[in-house]
Amino acid sequence: FQWAKRHGLAVEKDNMNEIIIDKPASPGCENVPRVIFQAHMDMVCVCEEGVTYDPMNDPIKVINDGVTLTADGTSLGADDGIGVAMCLYLLQDDTLRHGPIRAIFTTNEEDGMDSMDIDPKYLDGDYLVNLDWETLGSLCNSCAGGDFFNYSHKAEWEKPIVGCKTLTISFSGLLGGHSGVGINKGHANALVSIATLLAMLRQGGVSYCVFS
């Protein structure tokens, strides 16, 4: 918000803390269609095993080897920091000739898609370009969606079985991957793998109880 003010750009913030910045057209390009560029500001905050990291208070330690930016022990935030950086570049570069530009920086994309509730008045452009695609130099003409559901189950508590052995099962070292572009790669999912193992034990006649 303050960055836009310093650059003399019109800026608004809605009740979801989303930032909307407008840059007027270059002289002679006033009648060129308006393009809206959108990127999201939130990120997935994870860290490597053994790393102490509080994303609300600890800064990201960026490693720059001259070619690639990575983070030291944590996620970098390139999703969608790259898109945010692209928007800021377009807004601050006065050497580019362009029509009217609007940049929308949204919040809570990773776990809620709350930006669907943005005021439609901010979407009055001719083109909308989402800067959250996977590959530089390519465009994806499509849309994505998601669904949420709640599941509840009333647990029936039992006393521990006397004389049984206690085991801890953990799955780690998996390849992971993006649930969108990596869902077809056949990588193992830890939750599914544990559930499959428990089902196989039950089918094999192994009696067990699960506790937390």
List the model feature ranges, each with a label.
Residues F1-P33:
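A non-catalytic alpha/beta surface segment that caps or lines the substrate-entry region
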Residues A4, G8, C45, D94, ...:
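Structural signal for hydrophobic packing residues in well-ordered secondary-structure cores
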Residues A4, V84-L91, I194-L198:
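Buried hydrophobic packing segments
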Residues V11-E12, I101, V206:
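Hydrophobic anchor at the start of a short beta-strand
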Residues V11-M16, V32, G81-A85, M113, ...:
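Conserved active-site and cofactor/substrate-binding residues in soluble primary-metabolism enzymes
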Residues C29-D111, D117, G125-D126, T166:
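Active-site metal-coordination/substrate-binding segment of hydrolases
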Residues P59-K61, D65-T70, E109-S212:
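Midchain, well-structured core segments that form catalytic/ion-binding scaffolds
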